[in-house]
Amino acid sequence: MSEPVMRRTQSGEAKQLRTPAFRFHSPLANVLSLCSVLSVLSFVAPLQVHAATDASATVYSIPSAKAADSLLLDIDNAGKRLVAVGDRGHIVYSDDEGKTWTQAKVPTRMMLTALAFGDDKHGWAVGHDALILATEDGGTTWAQQFSDQEREEGAPFLDVWFKDDSTGFAVGAYGALFATTDGGKNWEDAGDRLDNPDGYHLNAITEVKGSGLFVVGEMGSMFRSSDDGETWETLKGPYEGSLFGVLGTAEPGTVLAYGLRGNLFRSTDFGTTWTPIKVKSPRGKLDFGLSGGALLKDGSIVIVGHGGSVLKSTDNGLTFTLINRPDRLSLSSATADDKGNLVLVGQGGVHVTSPTGEDASPKQ
């Protein structure tokens, strides 16, 4: 029998949840879960590692020839470079459109859940123990900026967003919202800017063109800001299940939110009203969780999920095509190279594909 799940409210009061929001399982069990790879796997208790003999010594990720094949949870473009992050503190990068990958030296063995670049050189990665890492050379080297191992027993940050090389936000478990205006030299706990008394997990943050910032999370929670995150409005969303991702589009005010069981919603008024987007597979309604995605340079949108699902839209999310990759490996995030080929990450590491998500290319 599992222990009751307790959560601190913003007032500091301990509150028992009616239903456990997340449970800790083995990494394999979480990979195979129907929930989002990004949000569920990020709560896996990190694998035990041998403690450094000197408690003050920095513990680096272990070099591995298979780092690009390990569980990876997010990927982003740093100029023409591709950078991906994931399990055991692995960060890998490629300068040849994903043909070959180099493992970066990273000062952690904690699971890294997300990353974002403010420009070609300045990037941030977040993960367990409320960890934030930063790079100033496009992902070649990394340094720790922030960590809070005492925060909710090492609960993770789940997403990070940067406007430029100075202004950014990190969001995560138990309502975590942290802000910086100096490139991460200082991080401010900005959770009290949100009306989130139950401390729902915040799973994703994005910018919506011409409108502002948007955050989604547990229990269908939604928040928007029109003033660069200084103040936030709580919205009544279209769905009471967990939302794992949110994307702006090339169309001003248009935003997509997605999560469990293939649920995908579109708004053209910055989240005031929503329309469900029906996506069908050859066997009927898409029933796999959707976990991550990206607005690509050409204005198209890609969303990925469990079971190798790859959704693609060229009309700002009004309609989507769907393919289920033959390997059926769960996917957590995606981007594209300069030729328009999709580069997917998740179970099995990096998958370089055609623009539709098919025709995997071998890694080296």
Language-model-derived ranges and their functions:
Residues 1-26:
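N-terminal secretory signal peptides that target proteins for export/translocation
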Residues 2, 49-364:
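Residue-level hotspots at or immediately adjacent to binding/recognition sites across diverse folds
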Residues 29-46:
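Bacterial N-terminal signal peptides
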